[in-house]
């Protein structure tokens, strides 16, 4: 959990100009919820210890859940929500962090020291160098990645990253989060004031088209879900885009939600609703 001692320890890594004060906690929660077995972070900083703490908490929770399953106490409410199949494999997650530690405007060089002080250094491997052309050296269980957090550079880095790494993200629900995909600034279009919400370093729609182009070149389908979270009170460094890979896309039905549920064997009746 994110204790007061943890927050005090990571405080020196916080840079107000990099906009990750809310992102760090968001990453912690998503990793706790999805319990990835392979995690990649490109771009060290304030978020790194949050990711590692989430993984440590996942390991402890998995072990406790397994003990509960083995005891099998009939009045244990936790057992009502656990999927037994998820506990047939050991949970020994891998975390790979990549940074060349060359950006003096970040706190990346301080991250290893803080992580060691928190006792989290055994949970990750640090590759000090470029993320480019790294994937040929990666083998299971490091790949495919269940969870990727990319916060590094500008448009060129985003394109290079997607080109190399998209095929190595788990196709069955692998999650990719990218930082700073929008900004809020005045714009001028055809000499008239434009929308205050404008694309950031790489607009999400451009990223998605790039993914589809890459998959098309390989003869593969690119299926995914997308959500972007924008902080309306910031001019920059205030957005995150989440892309979740899908192995298959469910077909769109011609009936309403209630009918689909009933057709799928879920008992009705269901309340009807309209938009």
Located regions from the model:
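Class I SAM-dependent methyltransferase Rossmann-like catalytic core
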Residues: 2-35, 49-53
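S-adenosylmethionine/decaboxylated-SAM
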Residues: 33, 37-275
């Amino acid at each position: 959990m994110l204790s007061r001692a943890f927050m005090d320890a990571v405080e020196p890594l916080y840079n107000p100009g990099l906009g990750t004060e809310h992102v760090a906690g968001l990453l912690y929660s998503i990793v706790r919820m999805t319990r990835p077995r392979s995690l990649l972070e490109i771009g060290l900083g304030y978020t790194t210890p949050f990711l590692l703490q989430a993984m440590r908490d996942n390991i402890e929770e998995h072990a406790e859940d397994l003990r509960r399953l083995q005891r099998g106490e009939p009045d244990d409410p936790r057992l009502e929500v656990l999927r037994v199949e998820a506990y047939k494999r050991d949970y020994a997650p891998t975390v790979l962090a990549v940074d060349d530690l060359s950006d003096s405007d970040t706190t990346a060089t301080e991250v290893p020291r803080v992580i060691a002080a928190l006792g989290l250094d055994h949970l990750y491997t640090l590759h000090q160098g470029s993320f480019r052309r790294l994937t040929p050296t990666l083998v299971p269980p490091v790949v495919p990645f269940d969870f990727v957090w990319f916060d590094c550079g500008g448009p060129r880095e985003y394109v290079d990253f997607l080109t190399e790494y998209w095929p190595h993200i788990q196709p069955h629900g692998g999650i990719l989060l990218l930082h700073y995909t929008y900004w809020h600034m005045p714009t001028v279009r055809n000499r008239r004031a434009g929308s205050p919400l404008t694309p950031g370093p790489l607009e999400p729609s451009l990223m998605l088209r790039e993914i589809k182009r890459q998959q098309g070149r390989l003869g593969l389908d690119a299926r995914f879900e997308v959500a972007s979270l924008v902080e309306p009170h910031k001019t920059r460094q205030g957005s995150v885009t989440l892309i979740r890979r899908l192995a298959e896309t469910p077909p769109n039905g011609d009936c309403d939600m209630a009918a689909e549920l009933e057709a799928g064997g879920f008992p009705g009746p269901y309340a009807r609703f309209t938009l």
